[in-house]
Amino acid sequence: MSSDALKALLQWGASFGVIVPEELKFLYTDLKGIICVCEKDIDNPSIKIPPEIVISRNLPMKFFGLSESTKNINGWLKLFFAKIKFDRDNDTIVDNVRVNDKFKPYLDALPSRLNSPLVWNPSELKRLSSTNIGNSIHEKFEGIFKEWFELVSSSDMFDLERVADDVQTFHNLDELTYEALYEKILKITELQRPTIWYSFPAFLWSHLIFISRAFPEYVLNRNCPDNSIVLLPIVDLLNHDYRSKVKWYPENGWFCYEKIGTASQSRELSNNYGGKGNEELLSGYGFVLEDNIFDSVALKVKLPLDVVSTILETEPSLKLPLLSDYTTYAFENKDCVQQEKKATRSATDYINGVTYFINIQNEQCLEPLLDLFTYLSKAEEEDLHDLRARLQGIQMLRNALQSKLNSITGPPATDDSYAIDPYRVYCADVYTKGQKQILKEALTRLKKLEKTMLSENKHQLLTMSKILKNDPAFAETELPSLFSNEDGEEVIFESTYDLLILWILLKTKKNSYPTKYEWVGQQYTNFKQTAYISDDAKAFHTAYFEKQDDVDLAEVDHAIQFVVDNSFTRTSSTTEETILVRK
């Protein structure tokens, strides 16, 4: 936005009665764009917007002839906004007012460049290729494209022949490279050059304006449909600061913004979108914050729906959050939100997975995740507090977080295919750096928790190193005698897991458990195995006992099942180590 466009916007707002205290001044800066600065100290400064310039669902309802029951009214609002921006040949008239002329100063003042990753060029997007944002781009496009197609194909007012290329792109989206999509759609959106107002590039531009600038209509109208949104000129110039204490409220149909407390001279007056991490800020608003205390990593866990159903029915203490549990508005319908969160949930609510957010500032953020991974690790007779299940859950969660950390690679090699915007590089670097820091901190906390649990419960844990130290007969005589008929061939033991199985087989056969480890024999005797022989048992028997008859397949299967259900494996240590747990 230029200084002239800002001046014209403020004059336009004043002509409709927008109230801005004289102590506040909007300025254009090269560093931050538009800012609002206090020229003097002012207590509780407020900005008030009259209903005449609120861009709401009333406009598309009247123009398109929609009803209160029309589905996706926000989608129609985005189409309407695209029309007043890009339909240069026809006036858009509502209540005998040329809406395109009425809002021209506002339209002219909107950003000439959008920084949402949804319109980054291929070279820029490569800097996000290994992150949640980069991995979700295709899915987001698919959702926006589908919304557009359902709207334009639902009414005869849209000539689909004129947007046939966009329709074809929608149907072939899975087959297109990102480079092709950028050339066909995104470049047109980014440069704001759609030639047809109901084309997908026009709709995408409007969509990006709304996700970066919209306010909940609930502030003005408590009886509005759920999630209904509005645009509020002038107020949407204020930048975000999570430390800013503000309130939004209606006053005789006007929207009112108020800064709580004193706004100091020469300081910027800011809005507050709520606590948002850099992933949400970059995806929705096109910027990031360094040292953002609300920064988080989203970890999506996809579970079979029958597992979800069982958890919902039998494990009420397990938290399976939906995205709506995290998403809040700075001014939300609390009654509606509470009812929504109390509503009975079903497995189909989690068809896209369960999403957890990890935040360094929240000491308890890993607990729900660890509970879930413990549940997924536990044997049928165990509960969430059993030591073995808990330790195995820690291993599973560590592996998942380490895998996610490993997937976030460094900046790609220099790519000259497209010009790269330095600001977008900055945003990508801050975002990815934050993701890595959070994952590393989470892994450190899990490692510390594991170390504490291993130390406090060492009397209940049996490692192969302890066995070799306290049961020398196993390695010196029993194990060699078991394989004495191998024709001189060297027997290689693959892991401590294999050695534990062999130890249990030998100790049980010879009834030679050392006194201090007799608990293993008792635990083994009490263990009930399943009726069928597993493929793992068959493979193990073939690997070690194919040439001898001393150990039958059923014995091997029993020992394997016992070790699986009574041990955990530290796969995150330098070497995998299987450890038996006393129950």
Swiss-Prot record:
GO CC list: cytoplasm; nucleus
InterPro entries: Efm1/Rkm1, SET_dom, SET_dom_sf, SETD3_SETD6_MTase
Localization per record: Cytoplasm; Nucleus
Keyword Chloroplast: no
This protein's UniProt keywords: Coiled coil, Cytoplasm, Methyltransferase, Nucleus, S-adenosyl-L-methionine, Transferase
Molecular functions (GO terms): protein-lysine N-methyltransferase activity
Domain (SET): residue spans on this chain: 22-274
Gene Ontology biological process terms in this record: methylation
Cross-referenced PANTHER family: PROTEIN-LYSINE N-METHYLTRANSFERASE EFM1-RELATED, UNCHARACTERIZED PUTATIVE METHYLTRANSFERASE
Other facts: Present with 4800 molecules/cell in log phase SD medium.
Family as reported in the entry's similarity comment: Belongs to the class V-like SAM-binding methyltransferase superfamily. RKM1 family.
Gene that encodes it: RKM1
Coiled coil, from the record: 378-407, 433-459
Primary residence: cytoplasm
Function of the molecule: S-adenosyl-L-methionine-dependent protein-lysine N-methyltransferase that monomethylates ribosomal protein S18 (RPS18A and RPS18B) at 'Lys-48' and dimethylates ribosomal protein L23 (RPL23A and RPL23B) at 'Lys-106' and 'Lys-110'.
Residues that bind S-adenosyl-L-methionine: Y273
Organism listed in the record: Saccharomyces cerevisiae (strain ATCC 204508 / S288c) (Baker's yeast)
Keyword Phosphoprotein set for record: no
Protein name per UniProt: Ribosomal lysine N-methyltransferase 1
Superkingdom of origin organism: Eukaryota
EC number: 2.1.1.-
